[in-house]
């Protein structure tokens, strides 16, 4: 079974820490067991106090804006990274972290994914994957960037990539992981399976065995963030 979700201004909810969330694929909306996916907006001058999550790894993909990402290292020291559009952040379970937007005028938009599993991913990973650090591979549909590999996220069970579909090209296949999704970062595509328009901010959520066919019928490239997770082996 496949599910489609899209961001809408009236679906964003203000949270107690000051950010706005728009829930996409979750356990309630898509019967997802491994992923909880949310669009998140941090308005200007929003500082989110450092904290930990003890039930999941947390993944950020920066869509728009610039911010600061605080991460605690295994030796107890803290490192603050600059984050920008296209950067990916992987926070392993129980890692102290905080994300802030110090801009006077620019909001920080991110895709937030909680990955639920038993066990513990490697806490010694760096945690921040800058967009310009990921090599780009050519593909029949355009290009592929492997942003999340076992070395970058500390687990064999999660894979993350940024895909670019060129005009006139098609990305097609079958979900091979337990859960998988595509999120349209920019551009507009058409899903033939299931049939639907995929505008920027739309998520297509799949389970193992589901077929997908995403066509770029426009004149501009389409960029997708794709994440998949299998049964935990940690």
PLM region spans:
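Short histidine-centered beta-strand/loop micro-motifs
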Residues: 26-27, 48-54, 71-72, 80-81, ...
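Glycine- and acidic-residue-biased ligand/ion/polar-headgroup-sensing regions
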Residues: 55-68, 72-73, 177-193
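Short acidic-glycine-tyrosine-enriched beta hairpin
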Residues: 74-92, 193-209
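A generic "binding-loop/recognition-motif" signal
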Residues: 55, 66, 95-96, 177, ...
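Double-stranded beta-helix
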Residues: 2-7, 72-77, 96-144, 213-234
């Amino acid at each position: 079974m496949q599910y489609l979700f899209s961001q809408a201004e009236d679906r964003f909810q203000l949270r107690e820490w000051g950010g706005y969330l728009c829930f996409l694929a979750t356990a309630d909306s898509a019967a997802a067991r491994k992923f909880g996916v949310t669009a998140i907006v941090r308005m200007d001058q929003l500082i989110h106090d450092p904290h930990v999550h003890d039930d999941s790894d947390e993944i950020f993909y920066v869509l728009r804006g610039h911010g600061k990402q605080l991460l605690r290292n295994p030796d107890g020291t803290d490192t603050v990274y600059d984050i920008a559009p296209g950067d990916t952040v992987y926070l392993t379970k129980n890692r102290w972290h905080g994300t802030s937007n110090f801009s006077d005028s620019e909001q920080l938009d991110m895709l937030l994914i909680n990955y639920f599993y038993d066990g513990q991913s490697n806490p010694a990973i760096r945690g921040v994957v800058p967009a310009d650090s990921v090599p780009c591979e050519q593909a029949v549909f355009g290009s592929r960037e492997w942003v999340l590999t076992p070395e970058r996220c500390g687990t064999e069970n999660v894979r993350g990539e940024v895909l670019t579909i060129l005009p006139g090209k098609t990305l097609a296949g079958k979900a091979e992981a337990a859960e998988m999704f595509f999120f349209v970062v920019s551009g507009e595509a058409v899903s033939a399976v299931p049939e639907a328009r995929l505008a920027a901010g739309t998520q297509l959520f799949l389970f193992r065995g589901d077929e997908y066919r995403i066509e770029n019928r426009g004149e501009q490239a389409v960029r997708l963030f794709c994440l998949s997770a299998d049964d935990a082996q940690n």
